Curated annotation (Swiss-Prot):
GO biological process: protein insertion into membrane; protein transport
Residues lipid-modified (N-palmitoyl cysteine): C19
Pfam families: 60KD_IMP (PF02096)
Residue positions bearing lipid (S-diacylglycerol cysteine): C19
Domain of life: Bacteria
Protein known as: Membrane protein insertase YidC
Leader sequence segment: 1-18
Gene name as annotated: yidC
Membrane-spanning residues: 450-470, 549-569, 571-591, 642-662, 694-714, 741-761
PROSITE patterns: PROKAR_LIPOPROTEIN
Membrane topology: Multi-pass membrane protein
Entries under InterPro entries matching the protein: Membr_insert_YidC, YidC/ALB3/OXA1/COX18, YidC/Oxa/ALB_C, YidC_ALB_C
Amino acid sequence: MNKRTLLFVSLIGIAFVGCQIFFGYNEFRSCKNLAEKQRKISEQTLAAVESVGLSVASWDTDVNGEEHKNNYAVRVGDKLFLLHNGEAAQSVYSSGESWSFVDHKCGFDNIHLALYRQQGSSFNPTNTGKVFLPTNHEGLPVLVVEFRNNKEPLVFLGEYAQGRISNKDSTIFGTALVFWRSGSDYIPLGLYDSREEKLVSLDLPITRAVIFGNDQDSAKSSDTANHYVLFNDYMQIIVSEESGSIEGINLPFASTNNKSIVNEIGFDRDLASEKSPEALFPGLSSKLPDGQQAKNSIGGYYPLLRRGLLSDSKKLLPLEYHALNVVSGRELATPVALRYRVLSYTPHSIQLESLDRSVQKVYKLPENPEEKPYVFETAITLTKETEDVWVTSGVPEVEIMSNASAPTIKYRVIKKNKGSLDKVKLPKVKEPLAVRRGVYPQWILNSNGYFGIILTPLSEIASGYGSLYISGSTAPTRLSAISPKNQLYPVSKYPGYETLLPLPKDAGTHRFLVYAGPLAEPTLKVLDKTITQEKGENPEYLDSISFRGVFAFITAPFAALLFIIMKFFKLVTGSWGISIILLTVFLKLLLYPLNAWSIRSMRRMQILSPYIQQIQQKYKNEPKRAQMEIMGLYKTNKVNPITGCLPLLIQLPFLIAMFDLLKSSFLLRGASFIPGWIDNLTAPDVLFSWQTSIWFIGNEFHLLPILLGIVMFLQQKVTSLHKKGPVTDQQKQQQVMGNMMAILFTAMFYNFPSGLNIYWLSSMILGVVQQWITNKILDSKHLKNEVVLNNKKHR
């Protein structure tokens, strides 16, 4: 090898070694920085959890020797957990105290977890239980204590999801002990093998957390979990043994129970006719107080709460979104306790207790449901001091109003001895949880438009409220089961919303009154009266009924007036459809003088039209002069060109008010006018339907908007019958505009409620009749074809 080659090889070798040293040093520095960051996070986390009884301590087997710095254990109250190989010592010493051996569990690779109890403590190994946790789609928040290379363990917060423990700030390299927080206690969940990414459950004589599907006991419990039914004439409540919460609230139809005011609508009939599982009630395997299984029936009820899709077990509503659940965690979607046992059960009440004895719940229907329709009470008892705990409302089912859903959240507060109702801005997908502090709601409403869930605290609670966005795929609506191939009601279009109220951190019992039913004047009035008599204060539940819309502040008085008149006509005729027609007649008679005056003014405008054209032709090069001459002509002949628009402008508030009324009045929901065609005044009429959806039209043919367009077209023809002489360009433009308006209104009203179409169609027909009659009268008596021009009369 010559010198040049030797030099080249040497330089290459030096460069390679230099690169290795450089990159190795950078990697070493990076690892060192990461270790320092992890240690800092661990110290902060450990400082936070030490306040609630979890700490890391060294231990030794010799009472006279110093505690070994490389032996570490996790202390939780009067229990000590430590990892060991081989046989466990019968006693150890830690924190200057003696600890006695209780039991141990083999994890993996000859790694054992031993359990010790503090000498003289009240810990009873036979008094144990299990806390069953759901497989949360967002991941369960856990506390991880990682043992690494005989060093002081790292403590950090992580998430358990699909068998893996993850943390954004730290990668798990060693063996870890995983805990789940239940209230103010940390309950061991398992031993985590980072190499196999496997969580081994701990079969130790202590209260422990169990993931459904990861433990034989939990799987067995899940399969045999029951539901229990409470019922009266107004509601059917389904209580879940797994969550200890309410999985379903079903309201009977008026057709099956004369005390109910809930009518069956098209969606209910469609699901029942298809014998869909979504139309089964109670729908879930449920027990009755006599121990018998509740029999499912097809239809007969309206499901107030979303149940997911009963036809697909994978699409059932997750346990954390059940109503009256007690939750905590970062997203307020982690139940504080799961898996309950029933302590007592009657047709009208049930008492449950969580297996870890941290939560007790009582659900009770009223003794006199006629005085408290659609109401029940719940009492939630927390046996331990627990921070950041909330109670949930559940997720209401979807109601369609004018081809869209209308979820609403409101709460009532007392300000300066006066009650006020405030509307809550709905949370969005990017920020699903919205929490507001510093307010004390008297009650909070979670509504789908026609129905609502009102939570009223009967005992003192913490300040604030929360609202939670839940994706439609997580909480699918029953409507998605209607024509799923055509995707008429895709789950992505209908997210759910949940309201939450905070509980005090102290142990104690917290009581709530729950209204779960229609936002209807009759029932809310009765409830207001009953509560006022009991408490001496009116809760004003009736305020939860409000008229919606951008112009509600203008149209609300009109809507209230229309509803009063409609109720009178309903009392006389017994039909809401006829009452809408009579309301239209009443308004036409009321506004007749103004409409007649407007028609007379329009007739004069038609007579002046040729003279206006002459002026425009004469002064075509002097537009200002032409405008002055035309205005003078109007003034001389006592004509106001704006008066022709007045009837439409005056009717507009009534039209919008009627639209708001149909979206707000529960009594009109499901009200039939012509069976088989107009079955629901708050939904479009359906003359016939088909399977395949067509753009804009959908899969239903609505006749009323077509009739409306025809009547508007005829109205233009009636108006043009009295125009004499050649048709001017302006008149041609008016005819074209009139025809376009007829087409526009047909398209605009196509998916509007049938009640609104009946109102506007009746108004248009009466308008045509009125115009024809008025024209006849004007032709014979009131209007001469005379025009004053230059102080001279012309014919």
